[in-house]
Amino acid sequence: MDVRALPWLPWLLWLLCRGGGDADSRAPFTPTWPRSREREAAAFRESLNRHRYLNSLFPSENSTAFYGINQFSYLFPEEFKAIYLRSKPSKFPRYSAEVHMSIPNVSLPLRFDWRDKQVVTQVRNQQMCGGCWAFSVVGAVESAYAIKGKPLEDLSVQQVIDCSYNNYGCNGGSTLNALNWLNKMQVKLVKDSEYPFKAQNGLCHYFSGSHSGFSIKGYSAYDFSDQEDEMAKALLTFGPLVVIVDAVSWQDYLGGIIQHHCSSGEANHAVLITGFDKTGSTPYWIVRNSWGSSWGVDGYAHVKMGSNVCGIADSVSSIFV
């Protein structure tokens, strides 16, 4: 169905998005700007204009991304960025097999996705908490243990938000700082059921040393720009990859392959790569987000491989357990 043929439909969708999406998508958050129905309606109108513009570019490109109404359409871009894009960029060393750890020279299949191995947990929703950095790191730990043959468990993101030092909880953080904290302190991540997500900062809850949990043995952190085949080999060898991207245009993403409208060197959002697909004319990374399953492609984004789109290869981490 072409929504352009139904001029009233966008306004109905706005009402649904404004109160809908995932059940927890409107968790408590105190904005620094005044909120009102009038402001949200103005933001929605701006979103419609932005969608038309984005969709008018590169119309002949195969499988290009398409943009439209979703749960973020009632936010102005500056509001969206202030709430959701809170990952702090870090400078990663450029990967070199001669200097750094050697990645096995495995043969790359045309398609691979760790979800097919049943070692990736379900998409979560960070709500109005800028904790993407914690969600991506915890997701990688969950998968690393499952790949080793352990049961797939939802681990506590809230524990990382509350306890990780050199980070700011729901006000933003660094994946590198979180990984350093997990590794240096040999923190045992507990299950989400023991330390559930609250979508806000809280006091760190400590567990005894004898309490069962999931710790890491180490991690790697490299810049794989211009080396995305090596990055894919790391994915196959070590498990899902924690990456930091420029996700400003992801506010409007509905599906297709993201090839434009973002840049390298502007990292602001942490996500988890679970696989890749090279079977079509435009190869792409399969990227798990933390904005709920109603966003994008069932909570995932597809990002073009080979061109460092959105800076996806600039800041890449693997976790070892």
UniProtKB/Swiss-Prot annotation:
Q: Which reaction does it catalyse?
A: The recombinant human enzyme hydrolyzes synthetic endopeptidase substrates including Z-Phe-Arg-NHMec and Z-Arg-Arg-NHMec
Q: Keyword annotations for this protein?
A: Disulfide bond, Glycoprotein, Hydrolase, Lysosome, Protease, Signal, Thiol protease, Zymogen
By its UniProt entry, which Pfam families does this protein fall under?
Answer: Peptidase_C1
Q: What is its main location?
A: other
Q: Which InterPro entries match?
A: Papain-like_cys_pep_sf, Pept_cys_AS, Pept_his_AS, Peptidase_C1A, Peptidase_C1A_C, Peptidase_C1A_papain-like
Mind telling me which residues form the propeptide? Answer: 24-107
- Disulphides: C129-C170, C163-C204, C262-C310
UniProt keyword Transport present:
no
Which SMART domains does the entry mention? Pept_C1 (SM00645)
Tissue specificity remark: Expressed in all tissues examined. High levels seen in the ovary, kidney and placenta while low levels seen in thymus and skeletal muscle.
GO terms, molecular function: cysteine-type endopeptidase activity
- PROSITE patterns membership: THIOL_PROTEASE_CYS, THIOL_PROTEASE_HIS
GO CC terms in record: extracellular space; lysosome
Q: What is its EC number?
A: 3.4.22.42
User: What is an annotated GO biological process for this record, any one?
Assistant: proteolysis involved in protein catabolic process
Which residues constitute the signal peptide according to the record?
A: 1-23
Q: Which domain of life is it from?
A: Eukaryota
Task: Provide the residues annotated with a glycan attachment (glycosylation).
Answer: N62, N105
Where does the record say this protein resides?
Answer: Lysosome
Active site positions: C132, H269, N289
Family the entry assigns: Belongs to the peptidase C1 family.
Reported function: Proteolytic enzyme possibly involved in normal cellular protein degradation and turnover.
* Annotated protein name in UniProt: Cathepsin O
| Species the sequence originates in | Homo sapiens
Q: What is the gene called?
A: CTSO
